UniProtKB/Swiss-Prot annotation:
One of its GO terms (biological process) is homoserine metabolic process. GO terms for cellular component: cytoplasm. The record marks R326 as: Important for acyl-CoA specificity. This is Homoserine O-succinyltransferase. Substrate binds at R227, D358. It holds the Pfam family Abhydrolase_1.
């Protein structure tokens, strides 16, 4: 952490935890009899309780969206670019909540948690959950925090899918949806990427059928490979060319003619894989990819997205990025058209950038200024 915190940082933050004893029915037909949700908050809830914002995290995210946990922290929260005083999600005006979703590995109940029935980690016995399950658990968190209505539910990628599901399932409990770099469902190609990632983990000899905790080991190679594959899909060809090109690491630009790391891009991907293993759980990664695969709100409406969104009451802001080939702009435009079919209020921005899918995490001026302007409008609307 820098010696002096930036003026636009929320600073040192604390995580909180709530325990829920009421069983949570799940889409898979099972239920969680009890569970914990870990979350962080930034800013102050106003007297009218009208300025609350829910941030939903993506696959590898957590409740730690902004700020630092201690002075020893090397990096701030995952959305530091957009959350803080004067930033798009302005913590001088909004009360911001971000929770680690069920099935996660950062404190909320998930595969690495102890199963009260067996007194061992859940591992593969943890139920597969859906975006809708997450939204229902988040609604219970809102109840516990005394928040009847969110000023907005905001998220990028998988987080944006949760925001859309909120508008469908709880239309009267949010004023706005901000969904960034999102899609109404995964394509066959995206499901294919997820399956390759899962196979990398499932076939690692150290996976042990998901019970690697009991073997005091971790499927490091499989999880690292899954992350390397995922990371390629989060970048664009242009971004990788600009960052790495065909640069070699050493040896005066000469090939080694072996399978050691030679290209800078190889070194980068291996580093991303190794560092990810130290902060993420393989069973959670498997679960998160399935959550993505299963998201398809139109499926219950004869695959008619317009019908799925017919009863939403929230206003929408959708933002896509030109070089995002994982969830390209056309996928956001599908949602725009479905909302327009229902004469719902919608704002849409397509940002020209070479940053790929991960652009939603970056401080790209056109993106952050549009995001900030929209959120300022919400602040005025709720008197924040």
């Amino acid at each position: 952490m820098p010696k002096h915190l930036p003026a636009d940082s929320v600073g040192i933050v604390e995580q909180h935890s709530l325990h829920f004893d009421e069983p949570l029915p799940l889409d898979c037909g099972r239920s969680l009899p009890a569970y914990d949700l870990v979350y962080e908050t930034y800013g102050e809830l106003n007297a009218e309780r009208s300025n609350a914002i829910l941030i939903c995290h993506a696959l590898s995210g957590s409740h730690h969206a902004a700020g630092y946990h201690s002075e020893e922290d090397r990096k701030p929260g995952w959305w530091e670019a957009c959350v803080g005083p004067g930033k798009p999600i302005d913590t001088d005006r909004f009360y911001v909540v971000c929770c680690n979703n069920l099935g996660g590995c950062h404190g909320s109940t998930g595969p690495s948690s102890i199963n009260p029935e067996t007194h061992r980690p859940y591992g593969p016995d943890f139920p597969l959950v859906t975006v809708r399950d997450w939204v229902h658990s988040q609604a219970r968190l809102a109840d516990a925090l005394g928040i009847e209505r969110w000023a907005a539910v905001v998220g990028g990628s998988l987080g944006g899918m949760q925001a859309i599901q909120w508008a469908i399932d709880y239309p009267d409990r949010l004023g706005h949806v901000v969904a960034i770099a999102v899609a109404p469902r995964l394509s066959a190609q995206n499901i294919g990427f997820n399956e390759v990632a899962r196979q990398a983990i499932l076939t690692d000899p150290e996976f042990h059928g998901g019970r690697y905790y009991e073997h005091h080991t971790v499927p490091r190679r499989g999880l690292a490979l899954a992350r390397m594959l995922g990371h390629i899909t989060y970048l664009s060809d242009d971004a990788m060319r600009d960052k790495f090109g065909r640069d070699l690491r050493a040896d005066g630009g000469r090939y080694k003619f072996n399978f050691d790391v030679e290209f800078e891009v190889e070194s980068y991907l291996r580093y991303q894989g190794r560092s990810f293993v130290d902060r993420f759980d393989a069973n959670t990664y498997l679960l998160m990819t399935k959550v993505l695969d299963y998201f398809d709100p139109a499926a219950e409406y004869d695959h008619d997205l317009s019908a799925a969104l017919a009863h939403v009451q929230a206003r929408f802001l959708l933002i896509s990025f030109s070089s995002d080939w994982r969830f390209p702009p056309e996928r956001s435009r599908e949602i725009v058209r479905a909302l327009e079919d229902n004469q719902k209020p919608i704002s849409y921005l397509e940002v020209e950038t070479s940053q790929g899918h991960d652009a939603f995490l970056k401080p790209i001026p056109v993106y952050t200024e549009a995001f900030r302007a929209y959120m300022q409008g919400i602040a005025r609307e709720v008197g924040a």
